C-alpha cells in the first residue's frame, strides 16, 4: 500500500540539475511526501542514485512512490514554457533564457555567438543569425542544450517564412536578414502597430533614394548604451557600422528582436512619399510625417 498509494500531498515542481548529487535529489523529493521510507527502499531497488535524470518534473498530487521513482529514473519531464521578447542583443537573450531553462547565460551566449553554428545555418555572422529568434512563447524541455535550442528556433524561423511572406519580401528587394534588420529599427521607433507600415515606408524611401536612414535607435545600439535618453550631436559622430547617420543603407544586423507585427509591417510597408518623421508634440507615441525638410522643420 505504501508503494502504490498516494504519497505526494500537493502538486509541485521539482527541478533536478545535472550536477546535483543524489542526496540532494532525494531530499528535494522527501520534503513533501508521506511514506518517505517506502521511497528510499524503492529508489534503492531501482538504483535511482546511479540512474536519475536531470529535468523539470511535476509531482502530481496523489502520485505513488513507484510513480515518482520511475519518473526520475526514466526522465519523464514536463516541458516548460519559454517566453522570448523585448531583447536587444544575444547576451540579453541569453540572460532572459537562463532564468527559464537549465542552461546558464554564459553557455547560451557563447552558443549564440558561435561562428560555426551561424555558418552551418547559412548566416554570415552570429549577429545576423540573431534574426532566427522570433518573439513568442514556446515549449521546451528545461534541460534543452543551447545547441538544440538554436536548432529548434531555426525550425520555427523556417516555418515563419511562409511562401506568402517570402513573396512580399522579394517585392521589397530585401533579403530575410534585411527585413528583420529594418523591422528592428521600426520596432524601436514605434510600439504603435498601426503606425509601423508607415514608418517602414519612410525607411524604404530612404533606402531607395540612397539617403542615410538617420535612425536614432541605431546610435544607442552602436554605443551599446540602451538607457541613452537624448541623442546629442556628438553621439551622431560615433564611429560604428551601426551608425546610420554616418553610413548609408541598413546596419549589418538587427538592433533588437523585433515584434512579428514589425516584421509584417516591413513586408506590407506603406507606399508613401514621406522622407521624415518626428514624435508628435503631444507625445502620445505617434509621429508627424513630412515629404520635405521644410515640412519636417514645421512639424
Describe each model-derived feature in a short phrase.
Residues 95, 101-103, 117-299:
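Bacterial extracytoplasmic/cell-wall-associated proteins, especially those involved in peptidoglycan
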Amino acid at each position: 500500500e505504501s508503494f502504490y498509494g498516494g504519497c505526494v500531498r500537493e502538486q509541485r515542481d521539482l527541478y533536478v540539475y545535472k550536477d546535483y548529487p543524489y542526496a540532494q535529489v532525494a531530499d528535494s523529493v522527501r520534503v513533501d511526501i508521506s511514506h518517505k521510507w517506502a521511497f528510499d527502499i524503492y529508489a534503492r531497488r531501482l538504483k535511482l542514485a546511479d540512474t536519475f535524470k536531470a529535468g523539470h518534473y511535476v509531482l502530481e498530487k496523489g502520485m505513488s512512490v513507484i510513480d515518482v521513482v520511475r519518473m526520475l529514473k526514466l526522465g519523464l519531464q514536463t516541458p516548460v514554457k519559454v517566453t522570448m521578447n523585448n531583447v536587444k542583443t544575444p547576451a540579453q537573450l541569453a540572460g532572459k533564457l537562463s532564468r527559464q531553462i537549465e542552461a546558464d547565460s554564459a553557455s547560451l551566449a557563447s552558443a549564440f555567438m558561435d561562428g560555426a553554428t551561424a555558418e552551418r545555418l547559412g548566416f554570415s555572422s552570429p549577429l545576423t543569425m540573431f534574426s532566427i529568434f522570433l518573439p513568442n512563447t514556446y515549449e521546451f524541455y528545461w534541460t534543452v542544450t543551447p545547441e538544440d535550442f538554436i536548432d529548434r528556433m531555426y525550425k520555427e524561423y523556417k516555418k515563419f517564412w511562409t511562401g506568402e511572406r517570402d513573396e512580399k519580401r522579394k517585392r521589397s528587394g530585401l533579403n530575410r536578414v534585411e527585413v528583420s534588420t529594418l523591422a528592428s529599427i521600426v520596432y524601436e521607433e514605434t510600439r504603435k502597430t498601426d503606425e509601423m507600415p508607415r514608418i517602414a515606408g519612410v525607411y524604404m524611401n530612404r533606402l531607395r533614394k540612397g539617403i542615410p536612414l538617420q535612425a536614432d535607435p541605431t546610435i544607442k545600439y552602436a554605443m551599446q548604451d540602451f538607457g541613452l535618453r537624448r541623442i546629442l550631436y556628438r553621439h551622431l559622430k560615433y564611429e560604428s557600422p551601426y551608425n546610420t547617420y554616418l553610413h548609408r543603407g541598413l546596419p549589418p544586423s538587427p538592433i533588437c528582436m523585433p515584434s512579428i507585427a514589425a516584421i509584417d509591417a516591413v513586408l506590407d510597408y506603406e507606399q508613401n512619399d514621406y522622407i521624415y518623421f518626428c514624435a508628435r508634440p503631444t507625445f502620445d507615441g505617434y509621429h508627424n510625417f513630412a515629404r520635405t525638410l521644410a515640412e519636417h522643420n514645421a512639424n
